[in-house]
Each structure stands twice: as structure tokens, then as C-alpha cells.
Swiss-Prot record:
Location of the protein in the cell: Nucleus, Nucleoplasm; Nucleus, Nucleolus
Ligand binding (S-adenosyl-L-methionine): H37, L39, G64, E85, D113, N128
Organism: Bos taurus
UniProt KW keywords: Methyltransferase, Nucleus, RNA-binding, rRNA processing, S-adenosyl-L-methionine, Transferase
Claim: RNA-binding is one of the keywords in the record: yes
UniProt region (Disordered), positions on chain: 1-22
Main localization category: nucleus
Uppermost EC category: transferase
Descriptive protein name: Dimethyladenosine transferase
Subunit structure: Part of the small subunit (SSU) processome, composed of more than 70 proteins and the RNA chaperone small nucleolar RNA (snoRNA) U3.
Length: 313
């Protein structure tokens, strides 16, 4: 019993020490569970803002402003900063930081979950993102209208490398091709974990995203439906990927709806498996693998399916 008590006491002390390490200079506790890792290196803050090439007339969206290290610098460069913050304690810190200064009138704070909010108009987005919202936030940004000029965002290193991966790269995936369909993506710099307070467990990178304007003339839901199927097993041939019974059931359902709408008679001996294989063969993609296919390849494949009445959404 005494040993158990001693071990429990040790764990309590360890937790107390960990909590102590999360305190800011003002005694504020950071919640790493929701991605509160404050970027503390002013050189990196300035470099990120420089990469955004802000104009004095810009409205800037910042997500996860924390204690305002980057916010204050953005306010000095832009016409207005709209900061989205989930934690009311950090909202109070933000207001306190600019209170009584000329910058206060240029700051607007949106309190709540940015993924659930309607994004306002903005020219540029600059953010040290909570890493757990990286993927949904990127696509919320890229599907946002009206178009913004650019986004300069901090991500977990591996996520950033997936964003910029090319066909044939080990990290090339659905995220890579979907992002690159809608935007130009560039890896700007690596950021070590010790530049944050408290330091995260992973290394980070900064990425610049510029949406393609006008966007490609493609139904994104259709596109993503096709890409989702092919990247489930990206090392498989497309012929093998489309042999999944769940995939064939979905495509047959969509095909029958298409035929019904367009008054097309379906033969009694119709086989969706044969139809799919015929399309893959005629387009030359039967033995191709998603890992090595680029955007143009997927556009040709999607058009090949659509021309035969097969849709993915």
C-alpha cells in the first residue's frame, strides 16, 4: 500500500510540473488538447507575415491568435484583422493587449469554432493553426467565396509535406491532389518545436496557399468521389480499386439514376463491372495506380466516366 501511495503522489507531482510548464508569463494556462501552442519567436512571426506580402488595404483573417504575438504585427501592417478564437480567456488577452492603442479599432474578434462559422470577407489568411483542424480548415478556405489572395499557414510538418507532395512521392495522397487542384501550394520554411510555448510533440512547417482564380471547371464533389475511391489503396491498379463491391453498388445506383433522368434504356444483361472495366481500358488507366497519377490524368479519367453516364456524387 505505501508503494502505491508513493507512486500516485509521484504522478500527481509530475502532472503539477507539467501544468506549471504550460503557464505563460501572466500565469495563463494553455490547453494543448485544443492545439494551444503559442508561437514565441518574433523572427519567425515576422517572416510569416513578410511571406504574406500584406497591403495596407488588406483585411486579414487569423485563426487561433493565442495571446496575440502575431495579431499585433498583423494589425501594424493591415487595414483590419479578424481573429477567430475558441477560448474566451485568450479573447480577453487579445483585447487587453491592444486596449488603449490605435490598433484596437482595427481588431475584430470572432469567438467560437471557426469550422462552424461563416467566414467573413478577407484578402489574406495568416495563422498558426490548431493542428487538429488543419485538413477541414484548408478545404473550408479553398471552397470559400469570394476568393482571397493567399494564405500563409503553420502546419504540422508531415501534413505540410502531404500538401505539397507530387505524384510518385511517398506522401502523395488524396489531400495532395485535392489541394493542388484548387490552389498553388508552396512549402516556405521549417519551424522547430522549441519556437512554441509550450512546445508541441511534432515539428512544424509554414505553407503558402494561393487559390486558383478562376477555379478549374470541375464539380468538386464528383472529383473528390473519384479520388476517394482511387486513393483508398493508392498502390493498387485502378482496375483492382474499382472491383470493390461497395464502389460498384454506388456507381450502379448513380448510373441507373442517370439513365432514368435521360430516358436511357438499360439492357437486362447490364453489368456495372464490365462497364467500369471498359471505361478504364478505353481511357488507358486500367493498369495505372493513383500514386503516380497527376491532376490531368484524373481529369481525363473523370471525363471518361461522366461521358458514359457514370457519376461519383
Amino acid at each position: 500500500m505505501p508503494k502505491i501511495k508513493s507512486a500516485a503522489s509521484g504522478r500527481r507531482r509530475e502532472r503539477q510540473q507539467q501544468r506549471g510548464q504550460l503557464k505563460s508569463a501572466g500565469g495563463l494556462m494553455f490547453n494543448t488538447g485544443i492545439g494551444q501552442h503559442i508561437l514565441k519567436n518574433p523572427l519567425i512571426v515576422n517572416s510569416i507575415i513578410d511571406k504574406a506580402a500584406l497591403r495596407p488595404t488588406d483585411v486579414v483573417l487569423e485563426v487561433g491568435p493565442g495571446t496575440g504575438n502575431m495579431t499585433v504585427k498583423l494589425l501594424e501592417k493591415a487595414k483590419k484583422v479578424i481573429a477567430c478564437e475558441l477560448d474566451p480567456r485568450l479573447v480577453a488577452e487579445l483585447h487587453k493587449r491592444v486596449q488603449g492603442t490605435p490598433l484596437a479599432s482595427k481588431l475584430q474578434v470572432m469567438v467560437g469554432d471557426v469550422l462552424k462559422a461563416d467566414l467573413p470577407f478577407f484578402d489574406a489568411c495568416v495563422a498558426n493553426l490548431p493542428y487538429q483542424i488543419s485538413s477541414p480548415f484548408v478545404f473550408k478556405l479553398l471552397l470559400h467565396r469570394p476568393f482571397f489572395r493567399c494564405a500563409v499557414l503553420m502546419f504540422q510538418r508531415e501534413f505540410a509535406l502531404r500538401l505539397v507532395a507530387k505524384p510518385g512521392d511517398k506522401l502523395y495522397c488524396r489531400l495532395s491532389i485535392n489541394t493542388q487542384l484548387l490552389a498553388r501550394v508552396d512549402h516556405l520554411m521549417k519551424v522547430g518545436k522549441n519556437n512554441f510555448r509550450p512546445p508541441p510533440k511534432v515539428e512544424s512547417s509554414v505553407v503558402r496557399i494561393e487559390p486558383k482564380n478562376p477555379p478549374p471547371p470541375i464539380n468538386f464533389q464528383e472529383w473528390d468521389g473519384l479520388v476517394r475511391i482511387t486513393f483508398v489503396r493508392k498502390n493498387k491498379t485502378l482496375s483492382a480499386a474499382f472491383k470493390s463491391s461497395a464502389v460498384q453498388q454506388l456507381l450502379e445506383k448513380n448510373y441507373r439514376i442517370h439513365c432514368s433522368v435521360h430516358n436511357i434504356i438499360i439492357p437486362e444483361d447490364f453489368s456495372i463491372a464490365d462497364k467500369i472495366q471498359q471505361i478504364l481500358t478505353s481511357t488507358g488507366f486500367s493498369d495505372k495506380r493513383a500514386r503516380s497519377m497527376d491532376i490531368d490524368d484524373f481529369i481525363r479519367l473523370l471525363h471518361g466516366f461522366n461521358a458514359e453516364g457514370i457519376h461519383f456524387s
